UniProtKB/Swiss-Prot annotation:
One of its GO terms (molecular function) is aspartate-tRNA ligase activity. This is Aspartate--tRNA ligase. CDD domains: AspRS_core (cd00777), EcAspRS_like_N (cd04317). It catalyses: tRNA(Asp) + L-aspartate + ATP = L-aspartyl-tRNA(Asp) + AMP + diphosphate. Homodimer. L-aspartate binds at E174, R220, H443, R484. Its main location: cytoplasm. Keywords: Aminoacyl-tRNA synthetase, ATP-binding, Cytoplasm, Ligase, Nucleotide-binding, Protein biosynthesis. ATP binds at R220, D221, E222, Q229, E477, G529, L530, D531, R532. GO terms for cellular component: cytoplasm.
């Protein structure tokens, strides 16, 4: 029999009608001579009632046999409940069962199918198809679908063209490691799964498409954390003939539309803008969380003449003030903060507390000569805790930025109802890599340098600035973009600055450089992390909660056991031989 409707959509207006529902048994219980069954489908729960006194004997027998997660088909009449359950959308009604069929049975599940499940992450991922039955998870994916639907409608209305770009591409250096795919036809050669459609979308601008978008899978072989996965989805945009402000305006409109449609939130436009340098110096992060204060303060000049070499001789001394919470931090808890700080390169963590109107702590005795000025500069008050880092400016910023976020979480200082968007602009073009011993692209090698700094491509690379912009939400990088290079000579200079010889530049990017001989228009774009955006909209702290079949922190899938070994015959066809390190 055809299903009449979803169980979770039955309401008082359906009283007196006969309907057929299909779904899973969430719970069955016997009470007062009646059999109550909670039927669950993707839209919610509906209570079914079997009365042995007037129900068919076969129906009663079937009802008695039901266990959790059995799949059933039920037909009956909608009736008003004697006692309504205000906690359920269907709580005013119940279904008097007239016919009941078991469509499939189920073993006892490894965890209960309900929100707030107590199961390890590995167990949830091993039985992901069960985990996804939970109402909370279903809601996450309804939200995700609504977000993508809204994005497509918005961009379609602005005459963007949805174009699919290749999944099998050329491996190019820079950025994260590629996932490689061996070619059977051209043995010894490899495709790469795209880290982004960067070059192909630029080529679409050269083709005259003018406005492109794609909701696209991307792949990066990098270390994983809560907001990263080896395969992820981004909303990819590229435009011709627009400046950075126009691209940002389009992006803000898109985000405002999504926020209104999915959360009912009206965001204020335009979004605030903050330079990269201000973000690093004041927040210790290029993706600052502006929902709380506790800004970094520079004390380098103030402490340069005190009798404490650790401060006086350090390239930079910076501090944060934890207002009104010194009593919550014992020496033991500060030692934990010190260990945390060392993860970011700091040699240690100095601290003082304001207690009974005076500074107290291990370094307080070295600060007596500047105590009044220090107290005034930092606005230190009773029961404040001050944390100092003395090191290079980079380490001081990074360490205190991480401490700022950690302490805000510990003290519950963050208003999780806020959505604070901002643009981080005026980026450096390059960043120094200690591992590589050279400058690397802060974004990618195709970013346009500012006109007034491009001359430094043959000089001091630290002075080259990029026409680049990142969009940040609540301390997460939501996406980033830039204007792109469209002049061949400038692109060649950029690649040379990154250490490419002319030969290697053409070997890797010859097709792009050749395209620049054929009227490449000015262009720019942006990519937004869809998984991360939906994660934040859903109020989650791990993107696995909004990806249907994610990988764990070892880039493995406990359900399918991917990645897995393959047969020798498959390797032979690819002319590959695998030697494991432990063999």
């Amino acid at each position: 029999m055809e299903r009449s409707m979803y169980a979770g959509r039955v309401r008082s207006e359906h009283i007196g009608t006969t309907i057929t529902l299909k779904g899973w048994v969430s719970r069955r219980r016997n009470l007062g001579g009646l059999i109550f069954i909670d039927l669950r489908d993707r839209e919610g729960l509906m209570q079914l009632v079997v009365n042995p006194e007037n129900a068919d004997a076969a129906v009663v027998e079937t009802a008695e046999s039901l266990r959790s997660e059995f799949v059933i088909e039920v037909t009956g009449t909608v009736e008003a409940r004697e006692q309504a359950n205000d906690n359920l959308p269907t709580g005013a009604v119940e279904l008097k069962v007239e016919d009941l069929k078991v469509l499939n049975t189920a073993k006892t599940t490894p965890f209960e199918i309900k929100d707030g499940v107590e199961a390890s992450d590995d167990t949830r991922m091993r039985y992901r198809y069960l985990d996804l039955r939970r109402p909370e998870m279903l809601e996450n994916f309804k939200l995700r679908a609504k977000v993508t639907h809204t994005i497509r409608n918005y961009l379609d209305d602005l005459e963007f063209i949805d174009v699919e770009t290749p999944m099998l591409t050329k491996s190019t250096p820079e950025g994260a490691r590629d996932y490689l795919v061996p070619s059977r036809v051209s043995q010894g050669h490899f495709y790469a799964l795209p880290q982004s459609p960067q070059i192909t979308k630029q080529l679409l601008m050269n083709a005259g498409f003018d406005r492109y978008y794609q909701i696209v899978k991307c792949f990066r072989d990098e270390d994983l954390r809560g907001d990263r996965q080896p395969e992820f989805t981004q909303v990819d945009l590229e435009t011709s003939f627009l400046n950075e402000q126009e691209i940002q305006d389009i992006t803000e409109g898109l985000i405002a539309k999504v926020m209104k449609e999915t959360k009912g939130v009206e965001v204020t436009l335009p979004f605030p803008r903050m330079s990269y340098d201000d973000a690093m110096n004041n927040y210790g992060s290029d993706k600052p969380d502006t929902r709380f204060d506790m800004l970094l303060q520079d004390l380098t000049e103030l402490v340069k003449d005190i009798d404490f070499k650790v401060f006086a001789e350090a390239p930079a001394v910076k501090a944060i003030v934890v207002k009104g919470n010194a009593d919550k931090y014992s020496r033991k808890s500060i030692d934990k903060l010190t260990d945390f700080a060392k993860q970011f390169g700091a040699k240690g963590l100095a601290w003082v507390k304001m207690t009974d109107g005076v500074l107290a702590g291990p370094v307080a005795k070295f600060l007596t000569s500047i105590e009044e000025k220090l107290t005034d500069t930092l606005q230190i008050e009773e029961n404040d805790l001050v944390l100092f880092v003395a090191d290079t400016l980079e380490i001081a910023n990074n360490t205190l930025g991480a401490l700022r976020n950690q302490i805000a979480k510990e003290l519950d200082m963050i208003d999780n109802t806020k959505f604070n968007f901002l643009w981080v602009v005026d980026w450096p073009m390059f960043e120094w890599s200690e591992e590589e011993g050279r400058y690397m692209s802060a974004h990618h090698p195709f970013t346009l340098p500012t006109e007034d700094s491009a001359a430094e491509l043959e000089g001091d690379l630290s002075k080259v600035r990029a026409v680049a912009y990142d969009i940040v939400l609540n301390g997460y990088e939501l996406g980033g973009g830039s204007l792109r290079i469209n002049q061949k000579d400038l692109q060649e200079r950029m690649l040379k600055a990154l250490g490419f010889s002319e030969e290697s530049a053409y070997e890797q990017f010859g097709f792009l450089l050749e395209a620049m001989d054929y009227g490449f228009p000015p262009h720019g774009g942006l990519a937004l992390g869809l998984d991360r955006f939906v994660m934040l909209l859903a109020g989650k702290d791990n993107i696995r909660e909004v990806i249907a079949f994610p990988k764990n922190n070892k880039a493995s899938d406990p359900m399918t056991q991917a990645p897995s070994l393959v047969a020798d015959k498959q390797l032979e066809e690819l002319a590959l031989h695998v030697e494991l390190e432990n063999e």
